[in-house]
Amino acid sequence: MLPEQFCVRMKEMLGEEYAAFYASYDLPKYQALRINPLKTERDTFLLQAPFSLNRVPWTTNGYYYSGNDQPGRHPYHEAGVYYIQEPSAMAPAEYLMAEPGERILDLCAAPGGKSTQIACSMQGEGLIVCNEIHPARAKILSENIERMGVCNALVTNETPQKLSDNFREYFDRILVDAPCSGEGMFRKNEDACDEWSPENVENCAARQAEILDCAAEMLKPGGRLVYSTCTFAPTENEGSISRFLERHPEFELLPAEKKDGMMPGVPAWTDHPAEGLEHTIRLWPHHLKGEGHYLAVLQKAGVLSRTCQGYCRNGVEKGISEKECKEFFAFAEENLVKNITGNFLKFGDQLYRMPEGMPSIRNLKVLRPGLHLGTLKKNRFEPSHALALALRPDQVKHVCSLESDSPQVKAYLNGQTLNMDGEKGWYLVTVDGYSIGWGKLAGGILKNHYPKGLRKNG
């Protein structure tokens, strides 16, 4: 049951369109996945996908799937071949237009759909900082970064204010997918209905202002800022943007192409509308196949320069010498076709390869400072699950190849050992050629190293 005050407001906003908007809540929700180009070519996946797929028109790799399909239960999901994501939510990252080699911030990043979408555009080059203020959600974010094979992410659990104190005019692009009243989630999540109130809308708008002000400080001159919400409330959309532009005249709204059913923002829905509000975008559930979203593309005055370093409070993270992680290099020589190079960082006995030019993480709450390589133990190295998911079969010397419909895949994901012949040592386990985890072979038995917390029962 939709909140009465919400319905009254939407009727005032939409007029003759309200009936179609209201009727959209009786339709089945649209479900989609986004193919991960860090793991597979789109055309390759479409040929082998065991699902009925239809293109999401506003994103390169997004596809609707049938309600009868269950891609979340397929081994490809565990291998990070795709990310299950609400179709409307795929739009904001497209408009960020991320490029390889840039510094990018996803300021409110959990659960990770938009971060991993941005990372795909970066192709492993540059730095993406993925931040989430809530610890439990930050953990989920970090797990999704791992599953999708992202190597150049710094995952933090900080307030926007703390980040803005550390980074001034540092990022080329910033996405603010702001916490909101979640009106676009009503069909998907009944709790969103129960938690809604006009007071919550106002509280969200106030919080959005604080977040946007922090983002403004962290963006380089000439940089791009994309703001998005999954709500319909003008106070949180056209209103939040108009008030932001009043406070920050150094920003302007950029025209953004409206694709396949997208509609413009409406200046009349807010007091003192900013110039160019019609350039912002609304995704309505009665105009397209999605739950609904709002987004605005803004640019900061100035000329964007990759050579502009910006301000980073504690400089660049120094890392450690190769001598301090000699166990890893011994493992790599024995098991990898080509050594992994870069700058390395130790967290206790955990070893990471940092993204190039990663800033100092001193005084920051960090969950993942780059690619987790594994654990340094006395005279040996144990590779991480993240490393398995970041590697391709042609990058390792030993592979255990399984087919997605085989009982061995189910057994492996359940944590069981597998019988196989071969040289003893570490094996990258794959499903239809996609990396899914590690096993260690000795005496014809492949010991299972799939993480206990991810294992499927039954």
Where are the language model's segments positioned?
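Polybasic, low-complexity RNA-engagement segments
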Residues: 1-13, 17-46, 291-293, 301-458
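Conserved AdoMet
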Residues: 34-90
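Conserved SAM-binding loop of SAM-dependent methyltransferases across substrates and taxa
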Residues: 111-124
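Helix-to-beta-strand junctions that scaffold the AdoMet/dcAdoMet cofactor pocket
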Residues: 123, 219-221
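Mobile active-site "lid"/loop adjacent to the S-adenosyl-L-methionine
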Residues: 136, 173-213, 230-237, 264-269
